[in-house]
């Protein structure tokens, strides 16, 4: 008899850093939120749904998943980036805390976000 395991809910989001952004510049933003006194905002065309179980946001950079940060929520707002001084408006996925590097996992980049499943 085959046993069917319950389907796990996707417990993370996956985003892609645009190729136009240099990692050295991005590290400055990662450093700014390391102590959780600020959040990083990632612009998306629409907000994810059913996010109560989302714990992490994984980052794709140059064709690889390279690490994750703690997911703290979503917003629909206007703000000025404290690192780049650029004005932003729209829908955002928010994350904060230290960036946890992982062994690279090949993954093709995309726009927006995707739901992702991880195991500790």
Describe the residue ranges of each PLM region:
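Short beta-strand-centered aromatic/proline hotspots
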Residues: 66-75
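Compositionally biased, charged N-terminal/linker segments
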Residues: 1-53, 61, 80, 86-91, ...
């Amino acid at each position: 008899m085959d046993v069917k395991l319950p389907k796990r809910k996707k417990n993370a989001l996956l985003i892609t850093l645009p190729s136009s952004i240099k990692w050295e510049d991005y590290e400055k933003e990662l450093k700014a939120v390391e102590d959780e006194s600020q959040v990083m905002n990632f612009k998306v065309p629409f907000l994810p749904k059913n996010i109560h179980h989302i714990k992490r946001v994984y980052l794709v950079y140059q064709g690889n998943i390279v690490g994750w940060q703690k997911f703290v929520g979503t917003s629909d707002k206007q703000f000025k980036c404290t690192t780049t001084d650029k004005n932003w408006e729209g829908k955002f996925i928010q994350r904060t805390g230290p960036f946890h590097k992982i062994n690279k996992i090949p993954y093709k980049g995309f726009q927006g976000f995707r739901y992702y499943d991880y195991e500790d």
